[in-house]
Design a protein with these regions (language model features):
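A short helix/loop element that forms part of the nucleotide-sugar donor recognition site in Leloir-type
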Residues: 188-201
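Conserved acidic donor-binding segment of nucleotide-sugar-dependent glycosyltransferases
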Residues: 323-335, 343-349
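Carbohydrate-associated surface elements
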Residues: 41, 161, 181
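Aromatic "clamp/platform" in nucleotide-sugar-dependent glycosyltransferases that forms part
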Residues: 291
Length: 400
């Protein structure tokens, strides 16, 4: 089987979608499934060594220098001239130009098409279109989602809570819950001491970590305010924020306004295969409070290094932050959260606690998830072939 992935984002753009695509493609290859990836070009990026990654000329995105948008003409030519006879199934990963191009391509060439719902737009659209009232933005996001989910044969949701949210919208397309899982590189033990030396962080000061996109929807404002409260109890604490994004300037100003800038370090993106494991290993507590995660892989990445996690449990993260995980799950309230961080710092040296966290992360190994994805593809392909031969009714075209 050969599967076409279509995505509006991929590396060097760092986010959860890029990570998910790379992880699944690597594991699917081990299982004998070939994938082709069509994604935008990024100016100045190094050429891909992998010939199965097909870059399409792109343009900029207003007010978003990190992202690119496909140019329609080149995208259509790539799909129709290079790929029409080469794929058995189309898998869409983003809801922008990639979605409409992927659906059109699949229909024109008689191919089954599925999509992964990676991004929960409802709660952060207003950050990027601030003139839009939040109530109207949510209505638009829901209608947009409902329409797109009806375009495909089946959907993949990274978590059960995300599936429940989609079904509450009125989505009737079948939804398979299938997390990405952690790739093997996440379990390579990091060198925390090396990371502290690299970034001139004292070895004896407790270190809080946030890793991820520095974006408004990640609710890092709350983490900074919580940290200001924590410093009253633990004035020796440091907070490292690893990542980049549109909220960086705002958060830098906020740290100054709170008077905590000397204890907060913004260090940018880290290399996933070298520096990032070391970063997690250096931490005494990983803190997270995003309200919009469809899964929350960074929580598992931290656990894989045995780093204590303190997090709210919103949307997709609820699937990870179970009672067995060993994580501290707290409400989005500064005092309660900071108290949990104090407790996590006390338990950070506990070897049994770290072992519990690692064991939980290991239960999310990505190869097992890839096997489930292969079964999903086979199921969808079989149902589609039955529809084509008239032995099974098409729920999309019939309106069921």
């Amino acid at each position: 089987m050969r599967v076409l992935f279509v995505s509006d984002v991929y590396f060097p753009r760092v986010n959860g979608v890029s990570t998910s695509i790379r992880t699944f493609r690597s594991d699917l290859a081990q299982l004998g499934i070939e994938t082709l990836l069509v994604t935008p070009e990024y100016p100045g990026a190094a050429a891909d060594a992998d010939p199965s990654i097909i870059r399409v000329p792109s343009g900029g995105v207003p007010r978003d220098p990190e992202d690119r948008r496909f140019l329609g003409g080149p995208l259509k030519r790539v799909l129709n001239r290079e790929l029409a006879a080469k794929v058995d199934l189309v898998h869409i990963h983003t809801p922008f130009i990639a979605h409409y191009a992927g659906v059109r391509f699949a229909r024109e060439h008689g191919l089954p098409v599925v999509a992964t719902y990676h991004t929960f737009f409802e709660d952060y659209l207003h950050h990027y279109v601030p003139i839009l009232p939040r109530r109207i933005g949510r209505w638009i996001a829901r209608r947009f989602t409902l329409s797109q989910c009806g375009d495909v044969a089946e959907l993949i949701s990274p978590s059960a809570p995300m599936r429940e949210a989609l079904q509450a919208y009125g989505v009737t397309t079948p939804i398979e819950v299938l997390p990405t899982g952690l790739g093997a590189e996440s379990f390579i033990r990091g060198d925390g001491a090396k990371f502290r030396r690299q970034f001139d962080l004292p070895p004896d000061r407790p270190l809080l970590l946030y890793v991820g996109r520095v974006a408004f929807e990640k609710n890092i404002d709350f983490l900074l305010r919580m940290f200001a409260r924590l410093l009253i109890r633990r004035p020796d604490a440091l907070f490292v924020i690893a990542g980049e994004g549109p909220a960086l300037a705002h958060l830098t100003r906020l740290s100054r306004e709170l008077g905590i800038q000397a204890a907060v370090r913004f260090i940018g993106y880290l290399d996933r295969r070298t520096d990032l494991p070391n970063c997690y290993a250096a931490g005494d507590a990983f803190v997270f409070a995003s309200r919009t995660e469809t899964q929350g892989l960074v929580l598992l990445e931290a656990m894989a290094q045995g780093t204590p996690v303190v997090s709210t449990a919103e949307l997709g993260t609820r699937s990870i932050l179970t009672a067995e995980s060993g994580a501290f799950v707290v409400p989005e309230e500064e005092e309660a959260f900071s108290a949990a961080v104090v407790q996590a710092l006390k338990l950070a040296p506990d070897a049994s606690r770290r072992a519990q966290l690692r064991a939980h992360a290991e239960s999310w190994a990505s190869l097992a998830m890839a096997r489930r994805l292969v079964s999903f593809y086979e199921k969808v392909s079989l149902a589609y072939s039955q529809i084509r031969t008239g032995s099974l009714r098409d729920p999309v075209s019939s309106g069921a």
